[in-house]
């Protein structure tokens, strides 16, 4: 699947995630199967504010934002898998494991994010996530969310 083919565009994503500019880091959802996997796209443009200072002569996509983009893709997988959002539940990003950054990402790159649903135990949900640029793995991580039930 390429970046021209998608199942959720930015308008759909805005209806799924609470994040907004400049912190919304997913542009499209390319593929999805509930409770199994999700493929997302992040376009990197020099106009993004963090590139102005990270770094001035050699702009590099910050690793911490790579993890955030991967987490947002995992959140879309959760929210689309459960269908209707429950206002009495919150999902917290609580952990990362075995994270490796293999290559730098620069303006003009497209980051393809592949999220694999690993397991859910009690209220913890675990994902294996890969970030890919030009068919090369630039980052991989295991990300953990915690589902908390809240009551009004």
From Swiss-Prot:
Keyword Lyase: yes
Listed GO biological process terms: fatty acid biosynthetic process; lipid A biosynthetic process
EC number in record: 4.2.1.59
MF terms in GO: (3R)-hydroxyacyl-[acyl-carrier-protein] dehydratase activity
Main localisation: cytoplasm
Annotated Gene Ontology cellular component terms: cytoplasm; membrane
Entry protein name: 3-hydroxyacyl-[acyl-carrier-protein] dehydratase FabZ
Native species: Buchnera aphidicola subsp. Schizaphis graminum (strain Sg)
